[in-house]
Amino acid sequence: MIKKLIHQATTLFVASVIATAALAAETVTVGGKFFTEQYILSEMTTQLLQAHSIPVKQITGMGSSLVRKAQENGEIDLYWEYTGTALIVYNKVTEQLSPKQTYNRVKELDGKKGLVWLKPSNANNTFALAVRKQDVAGNGLHTLSDLADAYRNKKEIKMAGTAEFIGRSDGIKNLQKAYDFRVPRSQLKSMEAGLTYTALKDGLVDVALVYATDGRIAAFDFELLKDDKQFFPSYAVVPVIRKETLEQYPELEVILNQLSVKLDDATMQRLNARVDIDKKSVRTVAAEFLTANNLL
């Protein structure tokens, strides 16, 4: 009798473990990188999936290469990626492509790896160089060609950039080649991404690296220098999902595409500012946006 009870208990335990594993396998893991825009996109995605009764968990605050590797390994099912990052960093494509060509190329290359790129948004979080609007009249800087002219004429212009920007192929090194100028080492300041904005706002530098959808651009009264030679790649933000996950939950394509078409530069700047400037919680900002756009 005791043996029979032990056998039954063991059977129930094993069945419980199998059921738990099956449930975990059905959970969609939403990933995200370590900056405000990604926290917002991950939270909106999580809330959307929850609203459609899809089991979901969220892992955010990851480095770019780490979240990509996690998705390729099946640890992350879904996150929002940038076309330029996938093209240059992950797929090592260095040729200059149009925004449409960039999207099509990464969709094709990543498709071979079991990753599906859904509908691209109109939010392009590309690199940009910014100046203070109050200085534009005096320094005459409106375009990157104007900036290049200023450096060629030996004007002292302090620039703030990140270590990543200074080292990447789509960063300062090749920007200087494209526009035929050179920033003297003494005038190029390397700092963390968030600090470039405050350095420019406080007048510690004259031009700074920013990201085109950052909420601080409008809040700090910056003007973006026009990339008149179209050097910077397109960084359209797009939901990317593992093929296996999409096959399990095909409704995700419609759900995520409905969100993607609502996003553009101005919208992301506003949402980012709500968190970074107005100090609203990511959860609140995400919920308000989804509700206002009839997505919840």
Feature-to-residue mapping (PLM):
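An extracytoplasmic/periplasmic, membrane-proximal ligand-sensing/linker region
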Residues: 37, 166-181, 250-296
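Extracytoplasmic "Venus flytrap"
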Residues: 27-43, 60-64, 164-167
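Ligand-binding "clamshell"
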Residues: 90-118, 204, 216-230
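A conserved helix-loop-strand patch within extracytoplasmic ligand-binding domains
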Residues: 101-158, 261-265
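Ligand-binding pocket segment of bilobal, Venus flytrap-like solute-binding proteins
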Residues: 154-227
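A bilobed periplasmic-binding-protein/Venus flytrap-type ligand-binding module shared by bacterial periplasmic
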Residues: 127-137, 236-249
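Short, polar/charged alpha-helical segment
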Residues: 36-55, 71, 173-177
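Beta->alpha turn/N-cap motifs
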Residues: 60-64, 74-87, 102, 193, ...
